[in-house]
Amino acid sequence: MIAIIDYGMGNIRSIEQALTSIGVEHLVTDRQREIVKSDGVILPGVGAFPKAMEALEAKKLVTVLQECGKTGKPLLGICLGMQLLFEKSEEMKSSNGLGLLPGVVRKLQVPYKIPHMGWNRLTKTKEMPIWNRVADGSFVYYVHSYYAECPNDMICGTSEYGISVPGLVAKGNIFGAQFHPEKSGEIGIQMLANFKGVVKQWKSSQLSI
């Protein structure tokens, strides 16, 4: 069972539809107990970083998400949800994030239209499970004005938009997609199926303990 975190700022319906299309058992929840019992977590997000953190804090979800990350449970952040995984953001004001990944979220300073919206090529920079059966250079769908500045060894895929934008990041059991896999057609669906595989493998490892 994958828990989709409902804190009032996520593109939940599209993610639900994508997971349903590939037979992934899931639930939308803001309950700590259900999140703890889940086998994997998806943290969506659309909007501003400070308001998102305030919403998570109001629902008392910050600690449970941090614990999920630290215990090895697979966690996938999407768009703003990916940004929330990092230590800090400069959006609107300096705000602390979940601190599960090292790095700072900064505003795109590029000679192009902001937000970065539409299809862009994702170039593989490092192998990770979510790349399975996905061709290097596949096109994915973005909508964002901020990006994660983070260590190179975490970056698994980038897109060019005036700068090299980290599109896919990973560290241990924590994964982040700056783009929207649920809006990225068959490529995005395959990536979500790959995350399902990561969750299944982790669940099996827990049963064998």
UniProtKB/Swiss-Prot annotation:
InterPro entries: Class_I_gatase-like, GATASE, Imidazole-glycPsynth_HisH. Keywords: Amino-acid biosynthesis, Cytoplasm, Glutamine amidotransferase, Histidine biosynthesis, Hydrolase, Lyase. Residues 1-205 form the Glutamine amidotransferase type-1 domain. The keyword Secreted does not apply. SUPFAM superfamilies: Class I glutamine amidotransferase-like. It is found in: Cytoplasm. The active site is at C79 (nucleophile), H180, E182. One of its GO terms (biological process) is L-histidine biosynthetic process. It catalyses: 5-[(5-phospho-1-deoxy-D-ribulos-1-ylimino)methylamino]-1-(5-phospho-beta-D-ribosyl)imidazole-4-carboxamide + L-glutamine = D-erythro-1-(imidazol-4-yl)glycerol 3-phosphate + 5-amino-1-(5-phospho-beta-D-ribosyl)imidazole-4-carboxamide + L-glutamate + H(+); L-glutamine + H2O = L-glutamate + NH4(+). One of its GO terms (molecular function) is lyase activity. Its EC number is 4.3.2.10, 3.5.1.2. GO terms for cellular component: cytoplasm. The keyword Magnesium does not apply. Pathway: Amino-acid biosynthesis; L-histidine biosynthesis; L-histidine from 5-phospho-alpha-D-ribose 1-diphosphate: step 5/9. IGPS catalyzes the conversion of PRFAR and glutamine to IGP, AICAR and glutamate. The HisH subunit catalyzes the hydrolysis of glutamine to glutamate and ammonia as part of the synthesis of IGP and AICAR. The resulting ammonia molecule is channeled to the active site of HisF. HAMAP family: HisH. Heterodimer of HisH and HisF. This is Imidazole glycerol phosphate synthase subunit HisH. It comes from Bacillus cytotoxicus (strain DSM 22905 / CIP 110041 / 391-98 / NVH 391-98). The gene is hisH.
